[in-house]
């Protein structure tokens, strides 16, 4: 085993440890904000795993979609909701024990199956002496050419649709905030028999 394979295995072990610790944190942490950040760690480590395995487009898509969009949306949703102050010290009852036992059994079964499977017999990639490093790097470039060449009209229509949805969501949120402020100010103001102006 040469030094590059040793470094590759070490980086893979670090990334897999990050996935394991982040997923445990996402499940076991009681504070929902910390749980959402642990989920972000899992998504980031999965993206790094794709980078290490030379799947650069899948890694970039994972990073943009899951870390950049879904996890940020989850964190915002958790921070906007009104969480009770005493939710940090919730008691763990029988449901927690059942869930932990089920997850432990599932983890044991998956570990047994993964360990006893002959992965060399299941290879879907033809084993040849041709290096595929050149084609892996050009996949993103070819995808970009297709996306902005042959599929430019659906791509632009999708961007217009997303822009309209974003503007509509901002408009709804702004009107709702103005309604809440007006409602609070009307409730706190003393009642007078006069006009609003």
From Swiss-Prot:
GO terms for cellular component: chloroplast thylakoid membrane. It comes from the Eukaryota. The chain crosses the membrane at residues 10-30, 39-59, 60-80, 94-114, 147-167. Keywords: Chloroplast, Membrane, NAD, NADP, Plastid, Plastoquinone, Quinone, Thylakoid, Translocase, Transmembrane, Transmembrane helix, Transport. It catalyses: a plastoquinone + NADH + (n+1) H(+)(in) = a plastoquinol + NAD(+) + n H(+)(out); a plastoquinone + NADPH + (n+1) H(+)(in) = a plastoquinol + NADP(+) + n H(+)(out). Disulfide bonds: none annotated. Its main location: plastid. It is found in: Plastid, Chloroplast thylakoid membrane. It is a multi-pass membrane protein. Signal peptide: none annotated. One of its GO terms (molecular function) is NADH dehydrogenase (ubiquinone) activity. Its EC number is 7.1.1.-. NDH shuttles electrons from NAD(P)H:plastoquinone, via FMN and iron-sulfur (Fe-S) centers, to quinones in the photosynthetic chain and possibly in a chloroplast respiratory chain. The immediate electron acceptor for the enzyme in this species is believed to be plastoquinone. Couples the redox reaction to proton translocation, and thus conserves the redox energy in a proton gradient. Belongs to the complex I subunit 6 family. NDH is composed of at least 16 different subunits, 5 of which are encoded in the nucleus. This is NAD(P)H-quinone oxidoreductase subunit 6, chloroplastic. The gene is ndhG.
């Amino acid at each position: 085993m040469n030094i590059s394979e040793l470094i590759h295995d070490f980086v893979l072990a670090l990334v897999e440890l990050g996935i394991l610790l982040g997923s445990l944190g996402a499940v076991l942490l009681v504070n929902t904000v910390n749980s959402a950040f642990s989920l972000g760690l899992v998504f980031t480590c999965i993206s790094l795993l794709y980078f290490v395995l030379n799947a650069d487009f899948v890694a970039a898509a994972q990073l943009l979609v899951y870390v950049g969009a879904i996890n940020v949306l989850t964190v915002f949703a958790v921070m906007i909701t009104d969480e009770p102050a005493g939710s940090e010290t919730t008691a763990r009852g029988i449901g927690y024990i059942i869930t932990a036992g089920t997850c432990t059994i599932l983890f044991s079964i998956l570990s047994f199956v993964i360990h006893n499977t002959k992965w060399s017999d299941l290879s879907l990639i033809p084993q040849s002496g041709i290096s595929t490093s050149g084609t892996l790097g050009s996949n993103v470039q070819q995808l970009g050419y297709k996306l902005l060449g042959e599929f430019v009209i659906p791509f632009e229509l999708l961007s217009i649709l997303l822009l309209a949805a974003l503007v509509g969501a901002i408009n709804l949120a702004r009107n709702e905030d103005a309604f809440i402020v007006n409602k609070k100010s009307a409730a706190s103001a003393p009642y007078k028999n006069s006009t609003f102006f």
